[in-house]
């Protein structure tokens, strides 16, 4: 088993992550490969302490130059040697010392399963009430199709069957974990264990913090990476028309969100996303074209049904009023009784 982790300026959180790794009780060998991306705080020193304390467990990679999240993650994946891969970033942590044992036991018993995950507790540093992810409504469908539509697997909950190489992960893919989930899932099945065995933090220094606090900033900084992720996913589902259509639908949404960025910066970002990711853009357009006739039909149908309903209502009202001696289609004004009847059915 290879535990792969990345860190950058996480001195406040890294000990809990490392303690969670060291606490795992297993009957199989485990290695922890943690790559620090040239942190400027005490994170490298703390990692070094754990490597000295558990020399048979930790394989630290302490960079002197920052290479970025994508390159750091890709490199640590390539360094793994285990049959299985478990992911956990330096600001999250595990709470169950049997987490890995439970997941490996399941995978060993179900060779058709390539992705095994579990719910996580989400804690908020702004004081908001804790929650669980994925929400209950998302747990009903654990198919690859559902995973393409929305990422329901939290990074620090997942264990994969390791693939021979990760050198071909496309550049700029972000979120890389969503891409990895799909990459492993298309070769088998997805399973979720019921226990909540990890904690995911939402804090101001997190990579995805702006996704929840500042949507404009999120799409300005992460929109191109989202587009790159969807473009890369097309290689994973190539030839599967239904799944390509799902990617097209998500792509249409991503381009709409990028397009909402105001000013020249927004236009430039949208044009760059379109130019750099033509297949994703084409599928997005195909999705919109496919939706347009249906939307027209629905609008027309809605109008016609409304007209029929209005006609039926008017006919019924006239029949009732005629039966009660009320208003009839004449040039005479309605009587008092007619007004009462009309009022009671309006």
Swiss-Prot record:
One of its GO terms (biological process) is biosynthetic process. Residues 322-346 are annotated as: Disordered. Pfam families: Glycos_transf_2. GO terms for cellular component: peptidoglycan-based cell wall; plasma membrane. It comes from the Bacteria. The lineage of its organism: Bacteria, Bacillati, Actinomycetota, Actinomycetes, Mycobacteriales. This is Uncharacterized protein Rv1520. It comes from Mycobacterium tuberculosis (strain ATCC 25618 / H37Rv). GO terms for molecular function: glycosyltransferase activity; hexosyltransferase activity.
């Amino acid at each position: 088993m290879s535990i792969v982790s990345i860190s950058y300026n996480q001195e406040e959180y890294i000990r809990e992550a490392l303690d969670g790794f060291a606490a795992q009780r297993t009957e199989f060998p485990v290695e922890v490969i943690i790559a620090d991306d040239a942190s400027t705080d005490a994170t490298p020193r703390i990692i070094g302490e754990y490597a000295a304390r558990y020399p048979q467990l930790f394989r630290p990679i302490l960079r002197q130059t920052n290479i970025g999240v994508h390159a750091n993650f890709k490199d640590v994946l390539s360094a793994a040697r285990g049959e299985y891969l478990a992911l956990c970033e330096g600001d999250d942590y595990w709470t169950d010392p049997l987490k890995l044992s439970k997941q490996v036991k399941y995978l060993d018993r179900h060779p058709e399963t390539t992705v095994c995950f579990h719910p996580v507790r989400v804690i908020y540093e702004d004081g908001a009430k804790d929650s669980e992810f994925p929400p209950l409504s998302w747990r009903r469908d654990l198919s690859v199709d559902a995973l393409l539509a929305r990422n329901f697997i939290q990074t620090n909950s997942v264990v994969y069957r390791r693939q021979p190489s990760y050198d071909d992960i496309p550049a700029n893919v972000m979120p890389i974990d969503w891409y990895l989930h799909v990459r492993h899932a298309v070769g088998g099945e997805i399973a979720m264990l019921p226990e909540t065995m990890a904690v995911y933090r939402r804090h101001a220094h997190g990579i995805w913090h702006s996704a929840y606090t500042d949507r404009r900033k999120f799409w300005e900084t992460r929109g191109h990476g989202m587009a790159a992720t969807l473009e890369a996913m097309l290689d994973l589902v190539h030839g599967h028309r239904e799944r390509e259509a799902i990617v097209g639908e998500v792509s249409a949404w991503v381009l709409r969100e990028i397009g909402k960025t105001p000013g020249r910066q927004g236009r430039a970002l949208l044009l760059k996303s379109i130019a750099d990711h033509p297949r994703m853009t084409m599928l997005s357009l195909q999705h919109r074209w496919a939706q347009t006739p249906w939307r027209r039909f629905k609008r027309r149908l809605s109008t016609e049904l409304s007209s029929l309903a209005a006609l039926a209502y008017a006919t019924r009202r006239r029949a009732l009023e005629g039966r009660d001696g009320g208003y009839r289609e004449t040039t005479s004004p309605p009587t008092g009784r007619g007004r009462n009847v009309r009022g009671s059915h309006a």
